[in-house]
Structure formats: structure tokens, C-alpha cells
């Protein structure tokens, strides 16, 4: 504690200024500058000082505010019922103190509904006569931002309820670990800055002025609060069950628990499970289950008295940087990676951490031999948070960023205002290798047996220089590869030959054009039907397709204007590679799945999720990630959870994996 009032005043001023700056970066710019636990420690210190020196309390203090200011670029929304923040604690002892306060106020023990604390962005959904009227962020708690146009592109948000009710529900908008990793990879390869964690990726994606951007970002929601629920709903647990029946996406891991011992067991359970969940959680939330008791307990100016968040302690380890490796991606972006002494962190052994670009490397001032603090950003990505300067070797020297490509030796450049460092040599062996590996990948041409090691050998032995060369390989060529015998040779040649029959969207995606992902390739192929028309399409024609923006359109037109691209397409066509769209007009003739919206859930025994999705899409189905009234069919495997229950509640047709395969085989038999 500060020794005098004057010292306390000075520390409070410093803390408020620092916390205001950090909160602005976190809530308003979606670009955090410190880890959550650092913010929490400073915030707790400010609370401690304000409690000790009542004369230092101020209505302007961040401890008396909710969230951040409202983004002036988005329409403002006034919340009829304020969207409050939550108090938080960091130990089981503090949870016990919360429970004692509740019992003292109520006069007897209470049951709690315990929920996972999803690391996302607070969201309000208002319905009028059963139709979505407005969606808004929390903002400062009193006034939020109108994000209705963007929320319409979040698949698990119902646009219409099965009952014509006027109501409001609230929850969390989040980005799954898979979607986050994919988004950051795409941004990294494009030379764009990456998001620090899934929470900020979700916030930045939801608060877009262009809804098309939101649509591409694969956001999800968990709904957990019903404002003024209908008569007969008496508890938080019951409210969540009833909201699920209305079609809202709720979290299946919530439980009604009668005592703190069970709550502690729940915390221990999900402390162990958190790494295996498909989304990020940063704690658990304890809520008095009885809604009448919630009303009796009421709120402070900032937080409800009937709920509290228990936040997981940060996992951070120290290790030593031994090397900084530079790798070249298929688009030419050169990325530094710190190679470190292996250390156990958040459920896995970590020995490498991306430094992303030269700017970050310089900002952190990482040097060989440095001891660094390592954590997992969003519980997913190993990341260096800082250098432990007190342990820096005396003979340490600043790290020099290379000026030559580590693969081909050509000069490295910065394009326009990119932070990324690039090799722009189209013949760079590393780029060629990455490009061919991508072309052969399961998501693209799906050439079984043609992985990175085989591609590396093919290039090293001068057998291929681009993707078209694959279709001119012979058995004699492949016999030159190490450990490649007759069976392996025949299998690879068959796989290459089969890939000639793929639909053109897989070829387009396989070319690895900047910013053109699998979904974009499919939309473009569906519109133009063949590669010739795609290659000659104008920017205006491309952007007329829903969700295709200027970035994708310009990348495509620039690529197809290159002479090398024209020659490559000609050689692919000469090799018999299909250049036509085989979707709705071809393979997807009449069949059970054609035109249906299908959801997959549970563990599939015969195919990976991606393989099954491709099969259904080839039959003309639309595969989505969440169950709603618009879902035509649910295909489920083992351990199917909330999606199956929701489909049953909505009376949506359901097929086991075996039944779905039987339907697919019926289609194959008809061919």
C-alpha cells in the first residue's frame, strides 16, 4: 500500500491513465497492448487504492465504467436495460468470499448456474414479433454500436423465431480456434497484420462497416441471458434451456450446482479441458440460479451482485532462444520463427514461436541467447511476450534482419506499406515447393501421396518446376525418388490422373492466388462455369458476386494477366486437367442432398469432416456449422451433443453417418 495520501494520489493517477490507454486499445481498437493478466493486476491495484482512500474515488474512474467508448463510425444504440460488466476473482478463496456475501444478503445457501466464460464480445439481440430487429454491442454499457447488418451473417443467430415474441437476449460473439488460426494464416500470407487473439479477431470482425467482411470471418455466438423472460421461467438454467428451444446457440457445458465443492470440481475439470475445446475460455462464470434472487440482490453501478467471473491464472514459462529461422511461404512472405529450448506450456511442448515480421522482431528486440517469457495467445498460439533483460548475455548483439531470400538468394523487399518481408522471385524454390504442396493438398486437388517430402524430392531432382509438370511425370521419373518402389509409383500416378477430373474451383484454389480461398474459388467457379471465363473476367464482374470484394478481384485479374499464368493454364489444359465447373450442372444431378442445408456433428468414423463436407457439396448440398430452422438435415456421428438435441427440438430430419453414406452411395449407383 502507498505510504501517504500524496503517494496514493500519484499512483492512482498513473494507474488510471495507463488503464484508460489499455482499455481504449482493447475495447475500441480491438488491438490489445498487454496480456489480460497484466491489465487485471493493475485494475485490482487501483480498486485496492480506491477502497483504502475513499477521497480518491471518482465517477470518472475506469473502475466505475463499463467497457469502452462507442465507435463513432457505427450507429449508436441505447440499451433500455444497461449491459453491465462482471466482477472477477482469481482464486477459489475469493469465490468463497463471493458465496458468503450472497448467503449473507439472501439469508440461506443458494444454487448456482455455472457457465464457461467465453472469450469474446458481448452482444445484444432484440426481436420484435419473432423477427430480429436489432443487434448491438455493449459499448460503454449504456450506449452500444448497431451491428444488425453484420449479425445477419452469423449463421447461428436466428433471423426469425418459431414464436412471434418481442424480447431481448444477450450473449457472447466469438471466433472458434479453427477460424482464428485460418484467418491469421490468410492475413499473414497476405502480408497483413495478424490478430492478437480470437477475442479481438471477433470484435474486429463484428464491428466492421462492411458486412461482407463479417460474413467471411466465420463468427459464432453463445446466448446466455434472457432479458425479462416469459412467465414460468424461474431460473437461469431453465432460461438457457428454453432459449435453445427457440433456436439460439447455447453452450452445453453449463451446469446447475448446489454447493461450492461442486463448483471447485467444475473449475478443475475445465482447467484441464480448456485446451481441447474448439473455442477459447478464460474462466468460468458463477450465477445465482434463481431469477427472483438475482432481482433481490440487484446491481452496483457497474456489475451485478449475483454473478462473478473466476479467471484462470495465466500460463507463462521462460525459455532460451537458440536460433531465428526464416521461412518462405507460397506467396513469398518471409517469416521469422524463434527456435527455443523445449518447454511445457498449456498442455503441449513448445519449441518454436513465430515472430511474424521484422517489425515485431525489432519491437521485442529478441536476440540469440535471450531468455524470453512465453505464453499462448488466446490459449492457442505460442507467443513471446517479452525478453528477460536481467538474464541477457553480456556479449549479446542486436539481431540483423536478412536482406537476401534464404531459399533463392534474391533481394528481399517490402511491397507498398506492408510490414511483411517478401521474396518476389517467382522461381524461388521454396515458393515453388509450397505452391505445389498446396496444389496437391486435400483441400485443393487432393493428390493422395504427394506430400511436402515428395514435392521436395521432385524439385531437388529437377523433375518439376510448377504444378503443370506433375501431369507429365512418368514411372521412370518417379523411380528416381528415394524409397519409391513400384506400388508407390503406381499409386501416385493414379492419384495424379484422378485429379484431372476435379471441378475447376479446386484447380482455381490450388493455383494459390493471393487472397483466393476455397469458398471464394467455389463462388467464382459457380458464376463463370469455366477457367477461360474466370481468367477473362473483369474486376467489375467479379465484385458483382456476393462476398467477392476488391481485394480478391484485383488479385485474380493481376494473376491472370501474367504471361507465366497463361502458359501454366495452357499446359494444365493440354495435360487433360478439367477446366469446367462440375457442380450443380454436372455431378449434382437429382439426389437426396441436392439443394439441402446440411449440418455435420459428432465424431465421424469413415471420413474426416472436410472429406464428408466435400462429398456433400459435390452433390449440391450447402454445409453449415450450426443448426437452425433453415437446416434441412443433420448428419451425426458418435458423441453428438447439443446440435443433435437442438435438431430434435426443432424436428429437423436426422441421419446417422451410415445412413448418410447410404444416401450418397444411392447417388453413386445412379451414375
Swiss-Prot record:
<dbReference type="GO" id="GO:0006260">
    <property type="term" value="P:DNA replication"/>
</dbReference>
<keyword id="KW-0235">DNA replication</keyword>
<dbReference type="GO" id="GO:0003677">
    <property type="term" value="F:DNA binding"/>
</dbReference>
<dbReference type="InterPro" id="IPR001679">
    <property type="entry name" value="DNA_ligase"/>
</dbReference>
<comment type="function">
    <text>DNA ligase that catalyzes the formation of phosphodiester linkages between 5'-phosphoryl and 3'-hydroxyl groups in double-stranded DNA using NAD as a coenzyme and as the energy source for the reaction. It is essential for DNA replication and repair of damaged DNA.</text>
</comment>
<dbReference type="InterPro" id="IPR001357">
    <property type="entry name" value="BRCT_dom"/>
</dbReference>
<dbReference type="InterPro" id="IPR036420">
    <property type="entry name" value="BRCT_dom_sf"/>
</dbReference>
<feature type="binding site">
    <location>
        <begin position="85"/>
        <end position="86"/>
    </location>
    <ligand>
        <name>NAD(+)</name>
    </ligand>
</feature>
<keyword id="KW-0436">Ligase</keyword>
<comment type="similarity">
    <text>Belongs to the NAD-dependent DNA ligase family. LigA subfamily.</text>
</comment>
<dbReference type="InterPro" id="IPR003583">
    <property type="entry name" value="Hlx-hairpin-Hlx_DNA-bd_motif"/>
</dbReference>
<dbReference type="InterPro" id="IPR004150">
    <property type="entry name" value="NAD_DNA_ligase_OB"/>
</dbReference>
<dbReference type="InterPro" id="IPR018239">
    <property type="entry name" value="DNA_ligase_AS"/>
</dbReference>
<keyword id="KW-0479">Metal-binding</keyword>
<feature type="binding site">
    <location>
        <begin position="36"/>
        <end position="40"/>
    </location>
    <ligand>
        <name>NAD(+)</name>
    </ligand>
</feature>
<dbReference type="InterPro" id="IPR004149">
    <property type="entry name" value="Znf_DNAligase_C4"/>
</dbReference>
<feature type="binding site">
    <location>
        <position position="311"/>
    </location>
    <ligand>
        <name>NAD(+)</name>
    </ligand>
</feature>
<dbReference type="GO" id="GO:0003911">
    <property type="term" value="F:DNA ligase (NAD+) activity"/>
</dbReference>
<keyword id="KW-0862">Zinc</keyword>
<keyword id="KW-0464">Manganese</keyword>
<dbReference type="InterPro" id="IPR041663">
    <property type="entry name" value="DisA/LigA_HHH"/>
</dbReference>
<keyword id="KW-0227">DNA damage</keyword>
<dbReference type="GO" id="GO:0006281">
    <property type="term" value="P:DNA repair"/>
</dbReference>
<feature type="active site" description="N6-AMP-lysine intermediate">
    <location>
        <position position="117"/>
    </location>
</feature>
<dbReference type="InterPro" id="IPR013840">
    <property type="entry name" value="DNAligase_N"/>
</dbReference>
<dbReference type="GO" id="GO:0005829">
    <property type="term" value="C:cytosol"/>
</dbReference>
<feature type="binding site">
    <location>
        <position position="138"/>
    </location>
    <ligand>
        <name>NAD(+)</name>
    </ligand>
</feature>
<feature type="binding site">
    <location>
        <position position="423"/>
    </location>
    <ligand>
        <name>Zn(2+)</name>
    </ligand>
</feature>
<dbReference type="Pfam" id="PF03120">
    <property type="entry name" value="DNA_ligase_OB"/>
</dbReference>
<dbReference type="GO" id="GO:0046872">
    <property type="term" value="F:metal ion binding"/>
</dbReference>
<dbReference type="InterPro" id="IPR013839">
    <property type="entry name" value="DNAligase_adenylation"/>
</dbReference>
<dbReference type="Pfam" id="PF12826">
    <property type="entry name" value="HHH_2"/>
</dbReference>
<dbReference type="Pfam" id="PF01653">
    <property type="entry name" value="DNA_ligase_aden"/>
</dbReference>
<dbReference type="InterPro" id="IPR012340">
    <property type="entry name" value="NA-bd_OB-fold"/>
</dbReference>
<feature type="binding site">
    <location>
        <position position="408"/>
    </location>
    <ligand>
        <name>Zn(2+)</name>
    </ligand>
</feature>
<protein>
    <recommendedName>
        <fullName>DNA ligase</fullName>
        <ecNumber>6.5.1.2</ecNumber>
    </recommendedName>
</protein>
<dbReference type="Pfam" id="PF00533">
    <property type="entry name" value="BRCT"/>
</dbReference>
<dbReference type="InterPro" id="IPR010994">
    <property type="entry name" value="RuvA_2-like"/>
</dbReference>
<feature type="binding site">
    <location>
        <position position="115"/>
    </location>
    <ligand>
        <name>NAD(+)</name>
    </ligand>
</feature>
<keyword id="KW-0234">DNA repair</keyword>
<feature type="binding site">
    <location>
        <position position="172"/>
    </location>
    <ligand>
        <name>NAD(+)</name>
    </ligand>
</feature>
<keyword id="KW-0520">NAD</keyword>
Amino acid at each position: 500500500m502507498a505510504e501517504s495520501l500524496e503517494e496514493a494520489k500519484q499512483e492512482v493517477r498513473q494507474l488510471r491513465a495507463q488503464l484508460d490507454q489499455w482499455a481504449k486499445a482493447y475495447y475500441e481498437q480491438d488491438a490489445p497492448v498487454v496480456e489480460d493478466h497484466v491489465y487485471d493486476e493493475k485494475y485490482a491495484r487501483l480498486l485496492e487504492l480506491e477502497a483504502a482512500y475513499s477521497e480518491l474515488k471518482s465517477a470518472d474512474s475506469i473502475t466505475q465504467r463499463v467497457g469502452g467508448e462507442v465507435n463513432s463510425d457505427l450507429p449508436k444504440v441505447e440499451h433500455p436495460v444497461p449491459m453491465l460488466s462482471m466482477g472477477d476473482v482469481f482464486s477459489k478463496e475469493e469465490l468463497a468470499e463471493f458465496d458468503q456475501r450472497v448467503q449473507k444478503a439472501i439469508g440461506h445457501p443458494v444454487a448456482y448456474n455455472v457457465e464457461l466464460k467465453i472469450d469474446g464480445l458481448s452482444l445484444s439481440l432484440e426481436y420484435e414479433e419473432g423477427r430480429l430487429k436489432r443487434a448491438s454491442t455493449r459499448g460503454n454499457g449504456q450506449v452500444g454500436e448497431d451491428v444488425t447488418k453484420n449479425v445477419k451473417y452469423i449463421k447461428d443467430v436466428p433471423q426469425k423465431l418459431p414464436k412471434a415474441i418481442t424480447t431481448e437476449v444477450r450473449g457472447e460473439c466469438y471466433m472458434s480456434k479453427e477460424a482464428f488460426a485460418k484467418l491469421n494464416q490468410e492475413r499473414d500470407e497476405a502480408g497483413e497484420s495478424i490478430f492478437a487473439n480470437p477475442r479481438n479477431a471477433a470484435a474486429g470482425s463484428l464491428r466492421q462497416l462492411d458486412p461482407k467482411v463479417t460474413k467471411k470471418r466465420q463468427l459464432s455466438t453463445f446466448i446466455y441471458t434472457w432479458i425479462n423472460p416469459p412467465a414460468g421461467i424461474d431460473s437461469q438454467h431453465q432460461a438457457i434451456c428454453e432459449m435453445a428451444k427457440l433456436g439460439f446457440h447455447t453452450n452445453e457445458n453449463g451446469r446447475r450446482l448446489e454447493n461450492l465443492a461442486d463448483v471447485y470440481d467444475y473449475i478443475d475439470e475445465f482447467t484441464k479441458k480448456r485446451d481441447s475445446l474448439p473455442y477459447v475460455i478464460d474462466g468460468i462464470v458463477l450465477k445465482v440460479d434463481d431469477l427472483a434472487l438475482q432481482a433481490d440482490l440487484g446491481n452496483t453501478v457497474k456489475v451485478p451482485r449475483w454473478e462473478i467471473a473466476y479467471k484462470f491464472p495465466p500460463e507463462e514459462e521462460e525459455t532460451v532462444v537458440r536460433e531465428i529461422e526464416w521461412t518462405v511461404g507460397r506467396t513469398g512472405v518471409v517469416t521469422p520463427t524463434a527456435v527455443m529450448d523445449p518447454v511445457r506450456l498449456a498442455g503441449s511442448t513448445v519449441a518454436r514461436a513465430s515472430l511474424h515480421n521484422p517489425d515485431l522482431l525489432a519491437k521485442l528486440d529478441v536476440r540469440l541467447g535471450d531468455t524470453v517469457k512465453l505464453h499462448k495467445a488466446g490459449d492457442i498460439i505460442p507467443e513471446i511476450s517479452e525478453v528477460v533483460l536481467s538474464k541477457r548475455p553480456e556479449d549479446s548483439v542486436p539481431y540483423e534482419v536478412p536482406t537476401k531470400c534464404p531459399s533463392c538468394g534474391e533481394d528481399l523487399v517490402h511491397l507498398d506499406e506492408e510490414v511483411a518481408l517478401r521474396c518476389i522471385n517467382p522461381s524461388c524454390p521454396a515458393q515453388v515447393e509450397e505452391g505445389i504442396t498446396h496444389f496437391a493438398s486435400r483441400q485443393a486437388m487432393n493428390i493422395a501421396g504427394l506430400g511436402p517430402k515428395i514435392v521436395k524430392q521432385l524439385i531437388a531432382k529437377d523433375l518439376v518446376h510448377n504444378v503443370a509438370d506433375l501431369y507429365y511425370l512418368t514411372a521412370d521419373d518417379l523411380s528416381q525418388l528415394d524409397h519409391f518402389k513400384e506400388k508407390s509409383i503406381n499409386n501416385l500416378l493414379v492419384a495424379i490422373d484422378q485429379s484431372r477430373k476435379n471441378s475447376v474451383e479446386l484447380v482455381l484454389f490450388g493455383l494459390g492466388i493471393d487472397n483466393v480461398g476455397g469458398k471464394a474459388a467455389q463462388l467464382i467457379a459457380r458464376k463463370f462455369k469455366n477457367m477461360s471465363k474466370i481468367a477473362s473476367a473483369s474486376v467489375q464482374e467479379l465484385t458483382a458476386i456476393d462476398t467477392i470484394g476488391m481485394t480478391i478481384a484485383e488479385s485474380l485479374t493481376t494473376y491472370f494477366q501474367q504471361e507465366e499464368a497463361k502458359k501454366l493454364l495452357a499446359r494444365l489444359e493440354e495435360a487433360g486437367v478439367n477446366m469446367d465447373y462440375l457442380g450443380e450442372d454436372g455431378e449434382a444431378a437429382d439426389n437426396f442432398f441436392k439443394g439441402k442445408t446440411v449440418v455435420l456433428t459428432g465424431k465421424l468414423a469413415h471420413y474426416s469432416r472436410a472429406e464428408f463436407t466435400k462429398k456433400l457439396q459435390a452433390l449440391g448440398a450447402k454445409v453449415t456449422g450450426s443448426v437452425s430452422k433453415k437446416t434441412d438435415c443433420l448428419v451425426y456421428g458418435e458423441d453428438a451433443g447439443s446440435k443433435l438435441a437442438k435438431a430434435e427440438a426443432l424436428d429437423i430430419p436426422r441421419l446417422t453417418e451410415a445412413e448418410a453414406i447410404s444416401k450418397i452411395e444411392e447417388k453413386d449407383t445412379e451414375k
